[in-house]
């Protein structure tokens, strides 16, 4: 039986893309992932993640990373919620892997609903397989199922690569891109002041953080 895991990296940041990773492996060989030492990607150092990502790709029967740019996220948010966007993205990765059993890290407060919605979305493109596939969704699935940990790792490594590329391309150091990062907040505030509340394409314009900065600049009359 072919099993797969899907997880995201970069759902919350205000800067940079979101990556959704998927890893597929024959269930009888899935113990290899445990032997490799995959764990929740957030608990690993960037170097260890990179090493593991290479090993995962070598041993997996299939893998795929979907990249969603800030502008794509902004456009989608005009017509759907973030939860609905996650369903569409997970389904797109599922289309590439087509396992017999999917373990998905729940991107919804209701894990069961998330699984149901993935099946519904997936049935639009793969109606027959959508009836057969077993989908198990749970919170922190990356800490329970090694195949989800593996998906989390390849997603995180790809997002980190893209963030570094953006920093080089723009000649900027905006920190991690997460709203809670002081360096990210400082970058956004300074950029907003210098560009009359307009932000570059690497920023998710629909994020509350950006709205807050725009409001703040309006109140202060955009003074440097």
From Swiss-Prot:
Q: Which family does it belong to?
A: Belongs to the RNase HII family.
The scientific name of the source species is Methanosarcina barkeri (strain Fusaro / DSM 804)
Q: What does this protein do?
A: Endonuclease that specifically degrades the RNA of RNA-DNA hybrids.
Q: Which GO terms describe its cellular component?
A: cytoplasm; ribonuclease H2 complex
Q: What does the record's cofactor remark say about binding?
A: Manganese or magnesium. Binds 1 divalent metal ion per monomer in the absence of substrate. May bind a second metal ion after substrate binding.
Q: Which EC class heads this enzyme's classification? A: hydrolase
User: So which cofactors does this thing need?
Assistant: Mn(2+); Mg(2+)
Q: Name one Pfam family in it.
A: RNase_HII
**Subcellular location as annotated:** Cytoplasm
Any Gene Ontology biological process: mismatch repair
State the reactions this protein catalyses: Endonucleolytic cleavage to 5'-phosphomonoester
- Specify the protein name: Ribonuclease HII
GO function term, MF aspect, one:
manganese ion binding
Domain (RNase H type-2): give its ranges.
Answer: 1-219
> Keywords, A to Z?
Cytoplasm, Endonuclease, Hydrolase, Manganese, Metal-binding, Nuclease
Superkingdom as given in the UniProt entry: Archaea
- Binding site residues for a divalent metal cation: 7-8, 105
Q: What is its EC number?
A: 3.1.26.4
